[in-house]
């Protein structure tokens, strides 16, 4: 069974890393984006871009539809990750963290608490900027996963 890397691609900073690391491996890459992120950039043969309608969660629904048990999904969306943990081989964050059934609930709880703070007009600290160190951590974790497949 072939392996696909499915990327929640509208704001993913590791797309180019994934494309490079999968070259010549037999692993295919599917990048999902909304039409508002349309690009005519030519991709390598092992890369396919799927565009979906703009709208809340449209990309997420398409990822759930396309994903299968041998796939690797890259997303920063905890809700999407929770739907995929038991469906695919691996779900990972673009900073290299792997989502598991033992860590997803605390991430969802934190997301809920942050949403409550925002609804009350409050503010909370957002994520720090993506760094070179984050990219290297992701690439190391991603290499480990694709070497296991």
From Swiss-Prot:
InterPro entries: UPF0178. HAMAP family: UPF0178. Belongs to the UPF0178 family. This is UPF0178 protein SERP0336.
